[in-house]
Amino acid sequence: GKSACELSPAVRHSLADLDIQVSTGPVVDFRLREHLRDLPKDGTVPLLYPGHFAASGLTWPLAGAKKPNAIQRSGATEKWLYPRGFYCVVRRFSSKEERRRVVAGVVDPGLLADAPMLGFENHLNLFHAHRHGLPEALARGLAVFLNTTAVDEQFRRFSGHTQVNATDLKRMTYPSRENLTRLGQWAMQQGQLTQAMIDAQFGTLTA
């Protein structure tokens, strides 16, 4: 049968319709190793990996993490950085054991000190507006939508592999900006979201 996403008339917009772009995180750590720092200090900006995102939200910096938390801001790294803002991110890889393929999170700049720029590591996909952040409610609404069971089921049917690439996310259809914003505003009024809450709220969307 068809997944709820395909059946819902509320989910029929391309990212181009929404004027949102999705890209692979441009910071490939082994190529920029000399610019990476374990912890933030003067002259660095946050470097975000999938490990910084958990069900409870974004945690940065991560103490004792195996990965660096920061990248030196310089002429050599500037072109790989994005300006401070709200972004929706999706992990590129999940393990076979994980319940979900599509795992989305939100970059909340309020949790990143006063960093003017941000680095996104290559194992994340990020949704942005012409290389800038999104309105907060839109970023949060995108994450809610991408974390629905319907999206995960649709993704599993169309893609046998455990990778989620930017091209896969470009091919999907989405709710309107208005509906995504509504989902985000709803999410901002809740505490911790459960799968049941997300799926129930998604079910209320109308075209």
Predicted segments with their positions:
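Polybasic, glycine- and aromatic-enriched phosphate-binding surface used to engage nucleic acids
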Residues: 3-192, 196-204
